Amino acid sequence: MSDKIKIPNDNISALLGAIDKKFEDQEDFLDIVQWNLRWFNAMQKDREEKIKQVLSVLNSDIFVFQEIEEKSLDNIAKTLSDEGLGSYRTAYGTTGGQQRIAIMWDMEWVRSKDDIKELFGKNAVTIPSGKDVFPRLPLWSYFYCKSTVSNKRGFDFQLVGLHLKSQMDKSGIGEDELQRTLAAVKLSDWLMKDASNLDSDTILLGDWNEPPEAPAWESFRRLEKEKKVKFLKINDQSNFSHLYYRNRNNPGSLLDLKVITSPYAKELNKVGGTIRWLALDDLLKSNKAAGVVKKIINEIKKEITDHMPVLTRFGLDQKKK
């Protein structure tokens, strides 16, 4: 008889209230937190401590980060491991200078099956002016996730961390949108061809720098219509991850997105989504003055980052295997 393996440090399920019933018996799940840390390096000790505190509460199976200096997460990973919150390892992209993509994973539950590397190469796809459509190359990884059921094999999956071109167009002729559009086309093509060479789920997530309805992502919406990926269905536009402030009803925008392929993978919309600090969440639901909301948002932006961490819980039905 197979028994469920107890997870003593599953803080995320505690924060969410419980493990969803559909995961209690026959299904396994994987928690991934996406977070743009905005120009983070290990010399910023106050920020490092605050970020470490947040990550110690979340202690996700995998974290995908953006705007990271190389090796700057190593101390955080060691501290989390020393405190018994996992056995974390880190990997960094090589492009983006001091604003790289990074992945941190808990080896107690997730193991890499191949070297973590960047896709495509520099200048593999450019716009007419010669600019690379990927200022930071997508960071690819291939993992095995251990099952929470004893005597059962876990599951393999591919994960690609993204940080696509920002909405800064110095030329004034829409080059940034063209870069994002061509990046999406390239990723869609890779997803349908190269990614399918491995018998596994594929997850693309990161800072896309535009909301899911943006024209640039038409290639993914087309694949979703063909039932080859999930995109709009798993990106709740009523949520927000990037902090700016216009008014009480429009405090941010959803720029941190995800795409997933596989008939087995399921995203729990009820519990997935942006993780907000309770103070901010309570304020947005209350009748507090808009000025108070703005003050809290500015404090978060100043102390940590202008992005909220985004949680996605993916599940795999072992009975379908």
Listing of model-derived features with the role each one plays in the protein:
Residues 1-20, 71, 133, 193-202, ...:
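Metal-dependent phosphoester-hydrolase catalytic domains
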Residues 164-185, 213-215:
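Active-site-proximal segments of metal-dependent phosphoesterases and phosphodiesterases across multiple
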Residues 56-60, 77-85, 109, 189-196, ...:
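Sec-exported extracytoplasmic/periplasmic mature domains
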Residues 68-160:
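Structured beta-strand-rich core segments of catalytic domains in phosphoester-bond hydrolases
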Residues 29-39, 114, 154-169, 173:
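Active-site-proximal beta-strand elements of phosphoester/diester hydrolases
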Residues 38, 68-69, 163-165, 208-211:
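Catalytic metal-binding/acid-base residues of hydrolase active sites
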